[in-house]
Swiss-Prot record:
Pfam families: Ribosomal_L6 (PF00347). This protein binds to the 23S rRNA, and is important in its secondary structure. It is located near the subunit interface in the base of the L7/L12 stalk, and near the tRNA binding site of the peptidyltransferase center. GO terms for biological process: cytoplasmic translation. GO terms for cellular component: cytosolic large ribosomal subunit. This is Large ribosomal subunit protein uL6.
């Protein structure tokens, strides 16, 4: 049985939740989100808590049970608090700045790398730190991964773009023969 699916979700102030058939509608201060469950789980909304139940006892139904509960929880947390990812740029001459609706980065290529900032996402650059904020956990993680992919950290000097909490395993360079 799913241990994740069993836990009810407390709905915080500032977030409204309504159920319409197999759809769950979430309304926050700034935006609205919806989650379609396609009838794979039963949805119960009562007294400021949202809970899910299995439709039947098949393994696939139990997997959906925990998945939809986690997705709903991520939407509620995103609408009430938001999600943040922080990237660090390390390297001589590597820098980033925001111009208009684009993130411009100098990453050692012969051209600047330009990444368009999607709607619903806030980005800020402070020295060599890029901060990405938004309500959609999946989107924030995807954007951070795409930016990191332009210049992932290399193991010898640690140059590149890395997550702020990422540890780079460093390698020793070549040793000379004597």
């Amino acid at each position: 049985m799913s241990r994740v699916g069993k836990k009810p979700i407390n709905i915080p102030k500032g977030v409204e939740v309504s159920v319409q058939g197999s759809k769950i509608l979430f309304k926050g201060a700034k935006e609205q989100k919806e989650l379609e469950t396609y009838g794979r789980v039963q949805i119960h909304l009562q007294d400021g808590t949202l809970s899910f139940a299995c439709v039947d006892s098949q393994a696939q139904s139990r997997a959906y049970w925990g998945t939809y509960r986690a997705l709903a929880n991520n939407i509620i947390v995103g609408l009430s608090q938001g999600f943040t990812k922080v990237l660090e740029i390390n390297g001589v001459g590597y820098k980033a700045n925001i111009s208009g609706k684009n993130l411009e980065m100098a990453l050692g290529f012969s051209h600047p790398v330009i990444y368009p900032i999607p709607a619903g996402v806030e980005m800020s650059v402070d020295k060599n730190t890029i901060t990405i904020k938004g309500a959609d956990k999946q989107q924030i993680g995807q954007i951070a991964a795409e930016i990191r992919k332009f210049r992932p950290p290399e193991p010898y000097k640690g140059k590149g773009i890395k997550y702020s909490d990422e540890m780079i395993v460093r390698k020793a360079g070549k040793t000379s023969k004597k």
